[in-house]
Amino acid sequence: MYLDAAEKQEIFGKYGKSNSDTGSTEAQIALFSYRISHLTEHMKLNRKDYSTERALTMLVAKRRRLLNYLKDKDITRYRSIVKELGLRK
């Protein structure tokens, strides 16, 4: 698998409150961003993989919903996570 438990713990430790903080919005957004970048690379090689294309679209939408939630709740945390991850907005 492209993402093992140690890599997940590293992502959660960097963007969450602790290594076991899997529920914070920032940690979830960071994990989705990692998965989106991996699937984007896969789609560059396999253009006709429509199930992966659908999964990628769903992940982007889920990340967008989390970003909208964070923007409504705490704009400073939203701006910091967008800047750290290098997202467009």
UniProtKB/Swiss-Prot annotation:
InterPro entries listed in its UniProt record: Ribosomal_uS15, Ribosomal_uS15_bac-type, uS15_NS1_RNA-bd_sf
One of the record's GO molecular function terms: structural constituent of ribosome
An example Gene Ontology CC term for this record: cytosolic small ribosomal subunit
PROSITE patterns: RIBOSOMAL_S15
Described purpose of this protein according to its UniProt entry: One of the primary rRNA binding proteins, it binds directly to 16S rRNA where it helps nucleate assembly of the platform of the 30S subunit by binding and bridging several RNA helices of the 16S rRNA.
Protein family: Belongs to the universal ribosomal protein uS15 family.
Subunit structure, interactors included: Part of the 30S ribosomal subunit. Forms a bridge to the 50S subunit in the 70S ribosome, contacting the 23S rRNA.
The name this protein goes by in its record: Small ribosomal subunit protein uS15
Species of provenance: Bacteroides thetaiotaomicron (strain ATCC 29148 / DSM 2079 / JCM 5827 / CCUG 10774 / NCTC 10582 / VPI-5482 / E50)
Gene: rpsO
